[in-house]
């Protein structure tokens, strides 16, 4: 999860059987983004995540990235993932404040934490647990 964006993933349920990587089917998730992928730091992060996920999975897991508005409006990404219309999405946590009022507390805000402070808080002081608790009722992980 970055300072200005988050990858929203919908749980697909518990694993029933264990299979080897060569037997695993290819997974391709439609992933709309809130920011154009041409924008440094705002939109290009999801391309890096997509590349790394594909590399780590041996090409078995692919994020099919869609530019803003191609699948759903930017403000509707979280709701679309929650409803099961999309498998994943990349958005800014602050866009969810109408549905999840506490999200501004965990998103980038003016005069807030510096990036290194935010990262320390998120990973070492309970920020990640707070974000997970806020999004869990929406089936977003």
Predicted regions and their residues:
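Contiguous mixed-secondary-structure segments that line small-molecule binding/active-site clefts
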Residues: 8-10, 51, 92-141
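Short loop->beta-strand "edge-of-pocket" segments that line small-molecule binding or catalytic clefts
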Residues: 29-30, 35-36, 135-141
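Short, polar/charged alpha-helical segment
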Residues: 39-64, 125, 129
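Short helix-initiation/N-cap motifs at beta->coil->alpha
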Residues: 65-79
């Amino acid at each position: 999860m970055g300072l200005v964006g988050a990858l929203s993933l919908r749980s697909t349920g518990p694993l029933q059987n264990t299979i080897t990587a060569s037997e695993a089917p290819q997974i391709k998730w439609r992933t709309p983004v809130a920011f154009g992928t041409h924008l440094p730091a705002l939109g290009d992060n999801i391309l890096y995540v997509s590349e790394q996920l594909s590399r780590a999975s041996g090409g078995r897991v692919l994020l099919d990235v869609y530019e803003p508005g191609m699948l759903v409006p930017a403000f509707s990404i979280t709701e679309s993932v929650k409803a099961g219309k999309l498998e994943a999405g990349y958005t800014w946590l602050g866009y969810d404040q109408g549905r999840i009022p506490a999200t501004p507390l965990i998103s980038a805000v003016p005069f807030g934490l510096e990036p290194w402070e935010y990262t320390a808080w998120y990973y070492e002081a309970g920020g990640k647990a707070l974000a997970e608790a806020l999004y869990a009722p929406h089936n977003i992980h």
